[in-house]
Amino acid sequence: MKKIKSLILAAAAFSLTAPVFTSCSSNDSDENLDNLVSEYTVNDNMVAAQKAKSGKDEAVLLVAFGSTWNNAFLAFDKTKQAYEAAFPNADVYFCFSSDICINRASVGENTDDEGNIVKRDYYEPRYLLHAIGAAKYSKIYVQSLQVIPGEEFAAVVASVKKFMNNGYIAKAHLDDDYLAKLQEDEAIFLGMPLLNDPEVDVPEVAAQLNALYAAEASQGVVAFMGHGNPDTYDTFKANVRYTQLEVALQALNPNYYVGTVDMPDNYKQDVLGRMQEKGINNGKVFLHALMSIAGDHAHNDMAGEGEEYWDPEEEESEDNSWFEYFKNKGYDVQVPVVGNHPLGLLELPGILNVWIQHTKDAEFLEDAYHSMYPEE
């Protein structure tokens, strides 16, 4: 197994210096202690029951940013099932890193296709990691379901480091000897995001996408919308993966483009500019989400239709959807759907297999553990 001491150190530095993000911040001192302990207890009991039932001694924890859309919940369910098939000797657990998604999913922000409000309970990585540790699994894999190794991935690394350093409230401290043994046995692993390796992952994902969308690319532009990070939060300079993916895709067909919601100089208007530089001023544009699931960004920022998604006085506004933007620029825009929804990357078997392979190749977290007790 590879060892990634440098990544842990970089993530630790990031967690100390980065600003607090509303979407995934938490502060134990600001929370009601009883409620906090209850969250740990709920997950501890759930994981203990699962381990007792299965008799398995390995655990896989899948970490997604999250969503509030039912089609995304179903995609997460199928992802978990795929992991259970790929790792028959492990119990598989799922969590969200976004507090906002956790809170809104629990109260039912969106409905299913029949109009029924859908509520789902998800928890932060710290609660599932604590529960897995309390159950004393002998081998733990934590798999990031992020697309790029950026801001959200750094938060995943920080969560694992906190777990290995017993960084919980006093009432939730784990057995320090157990954590030490995980480190000694090299039994705590981190699976990398989808586009982690520019030499391996980027061309593989490009090939998988081309296998799916070559027919569309033969008819017109195929534009993928990723998320990206603003410059301030461009952890590990991961935004470059979107540019690298576009280069790899265009080597297969020049009609592929990759833009983002948040990466500077790679918004929808920048994609249009690159298209026009090649003389593509009309024709078909097929839009696809380059995100793990098709949630709010895919349904609204990418595929939103109608007046609420278009302000002609502010054409390049982030509130204008990609669909309306390209349509009003004179293109024939299509958003392919399955059922009533666009697809996310986890719903594409060839892409999901890249994540699964990352778990199989997961890297041992060297020097993640430090005893909570002072050295004598």
What is each PLM-predicted segment?
Residues 1-10:
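Bacterial N-terminal signal peptides that target proteins for export
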Residues 25-376:
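Extended amphipathic ligand-handling, pore-lining, and cofactor/metal-binding catalytic surfaces
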Residues 19-23:
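C-terminal motif of bacterial Sec signal peptides marking the signal peptidase cleavage site
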Residues 9-18:
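Hydrophobic helical h-region of N-terminal Sec-dependent signal peptides
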